[in-house]
Structures are given as structure tokens and as C-alpha cells.
Amino acid sequence: MADKIDISLYEKARIVVYGDIMLDRYWYGQASRISPEAPIPVVNVDQIEARPGGAANVALNVAALGASVELMGVVGDDQESRELETLLNKKSINCHFHRLNDHPTVTKLRVLGQNQQLLRLDFEKTLKHYEDKGLLQRYQHSLSHAQAVILSDYAKGALFNVTAPIQRAREKGLPVLVDPKSVDFSRYAGATLLTPNLKEFEAVVGHCRTDQELEFKARALIHQYRFEAILITRGKQGMMLIQKEGAAINLVAHAREVYDVTGAGDTVIAVMAASLAAGGDFYEAAQLANLAAGLVVRKLGAATVTVPELRRALHQITASHHGILSEKALLLAVADARAHGETIVMTNGCFDILHAGHVHYLEAAKAMGHRLIVAVNDDNSVRRLKGKDRPINSLQARMEVLTALRAIDWVVPFSEDTPARLITEVLPNILVKGGDYQPSQIAGGDEVVKNGGKVLTIPIKEGFSTSRLVEKMLN
């Protein structure tokens, strides 16, 4: 999973964060009685905390990954902005604030009883028609040593003229990632990547009844506004990555326990930016961002994720339960995975000579769930299907090659012409085959659907075919 990105390279990244800066206050206490004055809980406050919020929390997330970060935006000339700057300086974040006398620092006060949020108070005034040439010049200077830019738009006015920051960064060849709150995505035209949540995305395009509709509307926006990709975060459903080219990729959520989703989007865009700066592509970056989101929602409040936490989570995913299993052992492993709320994806094939098309297909299949099972035709089964000269590689050799791929969790052999019986035993959440199949043609598909599962296809990577490779070798 995302093994092509060396996350230790995060510390070499330099990222500029520009946007709506906020201060988050938290009052914690116990709510054990109802007020005699009104039917509301009385909170006995025993702890007060202040944290950076908005674009400042994005910068904090970037810094937690070890990257160098410059933060710029608008604040009030008040105690809140000075408190915020002190908090950020402690994390080695370089702040460039434009302070306004008649504008308060956006502050959000949350009151919690037994760690449950009871009330939020907002202290803010939205900027209208704001543009500061001095801040834009500072931004231009910062671009000269940056590898990526994050524009954190909370619709508070700091990015009223968002076109200029996008254009100046793109002129220097830098990726521009935008966390959008505006319902007018044309404002972000030319940006590299947008990271809306599902609610924000549907506020722009309308309700999407299916994943196909979601992908279609996202792709239309990509072409209309010259984006390279859109990453839609969907809470418990995970994420969907839609790029200019290729099929959309669904990434299943990793979180088993969710305590607080506050600031999870900030973590996602921070990891995306750091991963792109470290040389990753959108898919690899999204895998890591999805993993980070699963970690941060287990924490209370607007929290961050560190490289050691990411590394441990990656190790747990890649190290657990990989290998060739018997059918009996597979069923036990599947039962254990289901007990932990994991989504099971299954596919099958001969996989006689593994090629890049197979790897692309298997990675896309793994992205649909937590565990990927690959059922492999044994030698006699391949011979019946492909002819007496096949397979080229023995069953054991084929399975050993497959287990070397990190996308695959379990490999299991079967002897029949189709894996229908095995699929009926496993009953995966998602059954996958290549795009040259119709869902109605896929063995075992009917039973999976009856059990509430899905039968999906993945487009075939053009130019790759085992049969053509064999023919080429023979000739």
C-alpha cells in the first residue's frame, strides 16, 4: 500500500498554506445536572484548551508530518491572534499574518461534557472584497522554495480573490491543493486537486444516487475547470479519487472507531500535499491520506497524525495475514476480518504470466476494501481452459509471485473450471473481474448479490495480455 512513497521524505518538503486562519477553543467539563433556570445541561468546566483551527490547523498537520510550512492569512489585531501565533511558533510554523484593526480573529468555542460536544459559539466577521497586495507579494516570495501549495478556503474571506494564488503557483509548476467551501468551483479553476467532502461536493452538483453519477459529475468539473483530480471524502464510506484519466478509485475507510471528525479534512489535504511533494502520485497520496484520516478521527478535537503513527499503521496493514492459504484457513481469516468490520474483496484468474495490467487491476481491486482475496486456477484447471501447453508457470510459482504483491492479502487455489463454489463459501462484500466481463457473466456473482454484496468490473489496462505474451515468446 502506497509503498512507492518514502514518507521519511516528508521532512524535506516545504509547503505553503494560505487561507482562513482560526483559533479553536475547547472548554471541557462534566455535565451531571440540568440548570434550574432552563432545560439545559450545566457544565462544570475543569479544563480549557486553545488550538489552531482552519488554515492554521492545516499548517499544524503539515508540521506534524515533519515538513517545513509557511502559513499566511488574515487575523485580527487582538489577543486571539497573538495566542494563535504563539501556539504555531512552538511548532516551528513560520507565520505571515495580515492583522486588521476592525476584524476579529475567527474564533470557535466548543463546550464539551464527558467529551461530548454540547455547544459551539462562533466569534467571526466575514471579510468582503478583501485583497492585500503585501500578503500576495509575501506569498509570491514563498513560492520560490516551495514544493506544494495548500489553499484552505473556509469561506471567511481571506481567499476572496483565490485566482491569483492559484495562477502564481501554477506558473511555477507547483501543485495547488484546495479544500473548498464555496459552492462556485469555477473560482478554483486551474487548481491541481480539490478535496471536498461529499456534502460540499453535492452542494455544487446536486445529489448523486450512485458512484457512477458521482464520478461522472466530478469528471465534468475536472474538464470544465482544468483540475487534474478531485478527492471526495465520504466519512464511513471512505474516499473516491477521480483523475483526469482512468477509472475512479474507491478507498474504503480504515477507521473502526470514530470519536471526532473535527479537522479530518485538514489532515487529508496535509498528507496529500506532503505525499505529492515527496514524489507520490494522486493514488499513492490518497491511500496515505485515507489511512491518516482513519487515525485522526480516533482522536478528540482537531488533531494531527505523525510519520511514526503512519508508519506503524502501514506496517500493520502490510504485515498481517499475507500469504497462500488453504480454503479452510481462508474461511477462518475471513471470519476474523469480518469480526473487525473489514470489507472483503475477491477476484480470480489464472495469472500465468504476471504483467503490468495485472498489477494495475489488483491494486484497483484492493482499493475497494480492506482485504483482497485472489483465487487461482490450479494447473489442471488452466489446462482445460487454455490448452495443453498452459500454464507456463506452475500453480505454486504463480501463487508465490502473487503473494509478493502488497495489494494482495490472501491467495487460495481452486480446482474447478470456475470459482463459483469457493465464492459461495466466502461470500465477499465485493466480487471483482476485468472490464471484459459483464457482471451477469461473473461466476458466483448471483450469490454475492443475494447476500447483499456487489459485483463490479475494473477496466482492463490496454496493451497487456498473457495470451499475447505467450504467442510473442513462441514466435
Curated annotation (Swiss-Prot):
GO terms for molecular function: ATP binding; heptose 7-phosphate kinase activity; heptose-1-phosphate adenylyltransferase activity; phosphotransferase activity, alcohol group as acceptor. Disulfide bonds: none annotated. InterPro entries: Bifunc_HldE, Carboh/pur_kinase_PfkB_CS, Cyt_trans-like, PfkB_dom, RfaE_dom_I, RfaE_dom_II, Ribokinase-like, Rossmann-like_a/b/a_fold. It comes from the Bacteria. Catalyzes the ADP transfer from ATP to D-glycero-beta-D-manno-heptose 1-phosphate, yielding ADP-D-glycero-beta-D-manno-heptose. Keywords: ATP-binding, Carbohydrate metabolism, Kinase, Multifunctional enzyme, Nucleotide-binding, Nucleotidyltransferase, Transferase. In the N-terminal section; belongs to the carbohydrate kinase PfkB family. The active site is at D266. PROSITE patterns: PFKB_KINASES_1. ATP binds at N197, L198, K199, E200. This is Bifunctional protein HldE. The keyword Cell membrane does not apply. Its EC number is 2.7.1.167, 2.7.7.70. It comes from Coxiella burnetii (strain RSA 493 / Nine Mile phase I). The keyword Ribonucleoprotein does not apply. Homodimer. It catalyses: D-glycero-beta-D-manno-heptose 7-phosphate + ATP = D-glycero-beta-D-manno-heptose 1,7-bisphosphate + ADP + H(+); D-glycero-beta-D-manno-heptose 1-phosphate + ATP + H(+) = ADP-D-glycero-beta-D-manno-heptose + diphosphate. Pathway: Nucleotide-sugar biosynthesis; ADP-L-glycero-beta-D-manno-heptose biosynthesis; ADP-L-glycero-beta-D-manno-heptose from D-glycero-beta-D-manno-heptose 7-phosphate: step 1/4; Nucleotide-sugar biosynthesis; ADP-L-glycero-beta-D-manno-heptose biosynthesis; ADP-L-glycero-beta-D-manno-heptose from D-glycero-beta-D-manno-heptose 7-phosphate: step 3/4. SUPFAM superfamilies: Nucleotidylyl transferase, Ribokinase-like. Residues 346-475 are annotated as: Cytidylyltransferase. GO terms for biological process: ADP-L-glycero-beta-D-manno-heptose biosynthetic process. Residues 1-321 are annotated as: Ribokinase. One of its GO terms (cellular component) is cytosol.
